[in-house]
UniProtKB/Swiss-Prot annotation:
Entry annotated with the keyword Hydrolase: yes
A Gene Ontology molecular function term of the record: dGTPase activity
Positions of region (Disordered): 1-28
Gene Ontology BP terms: dGTP catabolic process
One Pfam family hit: HD_assoc
Protein name: Deoxyguanosinetriphosphate triphosphohydrolase-like protein
Lineage, uppermost ranks: Bacteria, Pseudomonadati, Pseudomonadota, Gammaproteobacteria, Alteromonadales
InterPro entries in the record: dGTPase (IPR006261), dGTPase-like (IPR050135), dNTPase_2 (IPR023023), HD/PDEase_dom (IPR003607), HD_domain (IPR006674), PHydrolase_assoc_dom (IPR026875)
UniProtKB keywords: Hydrolase
Top-rank taxon: Bacteria
Length: 444
């Protein structure tokens, strides 16, 4: 398929700007970087709660690091496999995807996501990646109705789970809980896909594909111990972004945890160093002993050097592989880690999950955020024309008039909030101590 088709935008543009020689993907990158949705990431939870420590990473700093790693992957792939350079011609495209990948995540991380998914259980569900697609294509007010109006290839690249909700949802929703405080996240896992409300935009993104490619790309399968079906494929650009995200999550969130004293050297030795000392890869086997020493060093520069060495190890272990059965080159090729490094990254991610994410103090913050989000949603849906800010009321009324999913408007409003704004609004609504007016139409 020609570049021209993948460079198309849903809304035709004829911007006559003086001496503007930027590529389509440089424009996409600028739109993302200057958006309100991107700015709000500075006050949204990454792993450690906002306010726990001045050192922690927010979703904004995480996204910047993912972008840096993503362009690093792209650069080394160009050198390692120059025959694929025509497909990897734009660093700005990869930057755009990495900067935008978390834009749809709600306040309070996974707690907020589970809360919104529960409140939307009869109205198409909620999931952060689906909301990212929705912000980019509908909600961000760069245009009136087309979001940021990004290129088709950029939207293809943001699709981590390229299938609609109804194709992936398994079974009927669980019984509602009697009290929000009883809600268990394990009972309400989000369906990872595109909301049915945005299905026609997904169709537009995939329009250049052959019928065979489209059917294969949209296919899904059952994964052991996961309630809902999962998609099986992603584009080349998305595979690079996802690897960069995984590396940043495993390595940089580990750094936060070490600095803040959340994990110990003994835990690291038992769960990471020992398993990797058995690796068949000589780099992993030889380097990890010195990496471990430097990671837990009291000297900041030694720890930073260890983090840099880890990131470099993963980035240089990535190659482009062929995916059977696709005609479109953007789908036929994916970036993938060498098996030994894939296993090493899985071990690191499991370590962060076990000792950081599942830590009771972190789970308490998630639980608190979960309650805040559900109670805000309950309040707004009880009387939208009374409690929603005026611009959101207008959207809600328009959806009601057209017979569209008005619950989605409330999910859009709450998911766009920062952690701090949601907490203040909750206090304003439910605490007797709150007496001041709030500016509901502010940019959170």
């Amino acid at each position: 398929m020609t570049d021209a088709v993948w460079n198309e935008r849903r809304l035709g543009e004829d911007k006559q700007r003086r001496n503007d020689h930027r590529s389509p993907y440089q424009r996409d990158r600028a739109r993302i970087l200057h958006s309100a949705a991107f700015r709000r990431l500075q006050a949204k939870t990454q792993v450690l709660g906002v306010g726990m420590n001045d050192f922690y990473r927010t979703r904004l700093t995480h996204s910047l690091e993912v972008s840096q790693i993503g362009t690093g992957i792209c650069a080394q792939l160009k050198q390692k496999q120059p025959q694929h350079n025509p497909l990897l011609d734009s660093m700005s495209l990869i930057e755009s995807l990495c900067l935008a990948h978390d834009i749809g995540h709600p306040p309070f991380g996974h707690g907020g996501e589970v809360a919104l998914n529960y409140m939307m259980r009869k109205h198409g569900g909620f999931e952060g990646n689906g909301q990212t697609f929705r912000i980019l294509t509908r909600l961000e007010p760069y245009t009136e109705h087309f979001g940021m109006n990004l290129c088709r290839r950029t939207l293809l690249g943001i699709l981590k789970y390229p299938a609609p909700y109804t194709n992936l949802c398994v079974g009927t929703p669980e019984e509602s809980v009697d009290d929000f405080r009883q809600l268990k996240p394990s009972k309400w896992p989000p369906v990872k896909g595109i909301f049915d409300d945005d299905r026609e935009i997904l169709d537009w993104v995939l329009a250049p594909l052959s019928q065979q490619d489209r059917a294969k790309f949209l296919s899904s399968h059952v994964v052991k111990d996961i309630k809902h079906k999962r998609t099986r494929f992603k584009s080349l650009d998305c595979s690079i972004m996802e690897l960069a995200d995984d590396i940043a999550y495993a390595v940089h969130d580990l750094e936060d945890a070490i600095v803040m004293g959340i994990v110990s050297e003994q835990q690291w030795h038992t769960d990471v160093s020992l398993p990797l000392s058995q690796s068949n890869d000589p780099w992993l086997k030889n380097e990890f002993a010195t990496i471990s020493q430097r990671l837990f060093s009291a000297k900041h520069h030694l720890r930073k050097d260890a983090i840099g060495t880890l990131v470099n190890g993963f980035v240089t272990a990535i190659a482009i592989t062929e995916v059977d059965g696709f005609e479109e080159p953007l789908l036929r090729y994916n970036a993938a880690l060498e098996p030994a490094f894939h296993e090493a990254l899985s071990i690191l991610k499991q370590f962060v999950y076990k000792y950081v994410i599942r830590k009771p103090e972190i789970q308490m913050l998630e639980y608190k955020g979960q309650q805040i989000v559900m109670e805000l949603f309950e309040a707004f849906i009880s009387d939208p024309e009374r409690l929603l800010p005026l611009n959101t009321q207008e959207r809600w009324l328009a959806h009601e008039r057209l017979g569209e999913n008005s619950h989605r408007v409330i999910a859009d409003y709450i998911s766009g909030m920062t952690d701090g704004f949601a907490a203040r609004l909750h206090q304003h609504l439910f605490s007797a101590k709150s007496h001041s007016m709030m500016d509901f139409n502010s940019d959170f």
